[in-house]
Amino acid sequence: MAVHAHPDDESSSTGGVLARYADEGITTVVVTCTNGEYGDGPDHVKPGEAGHDPDQVAKTRLAELETACQILRVTHLETLGYHDSGMADWAYKDDGHVFSNVPLEESAGRVAALVERYRPDVLVTYDGPGAYNHPDHLRAHEVAVEASRRTGIPAKLYFIARRRRDWERLRERMAEAGIEMPAPPAAMLTPEFLRRMEETEQRITTTVDTTGVASRKRDALAAHASQLDQSWWVRFPDDAFLDVFGQETFIRAEDRTGEPVPEDDLFAGLR
């Protein structure tokens, strides 16, 4: 079970493992907490600009999410329907109805109920405060951790993590391909961000080979066309995409299997 903040996060952060484990016959569940209302509108208009309709954006993004999950062969998709909170420096995050302001007792309770229903051996979500502090990502982390704690069902809890060298390799391969890195992520690649990424890298326990399903991850990303149609995600040459995104890396935060780390399989010790 992967607990995500917005439509498209399932593909960018865990598309490889979702596709790989689905191909291995493992039941996969994606929980998407928000509708992504504050994503781009038509012609990439931003929230607050003329032509941006949050409700229509949500409708479009949820349809794209369904398509992406079909490409990744996700067994079950669960959408919680909470309202996108927007970026950390946007005023929307202060609205009482957005996901990051919904009481943890409520949102974690809903995810805990899904954990009880599907009884996943492995639960995956984001890392806590660190390099990327989007309010909805932080809340999804809190919700998933609390759901795991309440139920005691997952044998393993993982946090999504990228290595500093992955970001540096991304920048190199984009330059080689003549693709300008937009902001974000260009604005994120500050010395402080890279320092935090290096700290995160030291905590990584698990590296999963996803080269065999990289094309499906890319196709799933392309399904989110309203957000990514001209994105570097989909413009990257095939060999560069495989080089940078042929692995997905995680921090094993909780474990009841006793399996040693480092490991190369989220299900190590469970089969």
Which role fits each region the language model picked out?
Residues 1-3, 90-271:
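Metal-dependent de-N-acetylase/amidase catalytic core
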Residues 1-119, 146-150, 241, 251, ...:
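Active-site rim/loop-helix segments in enzyme catalytic domains that contact anionic ligands
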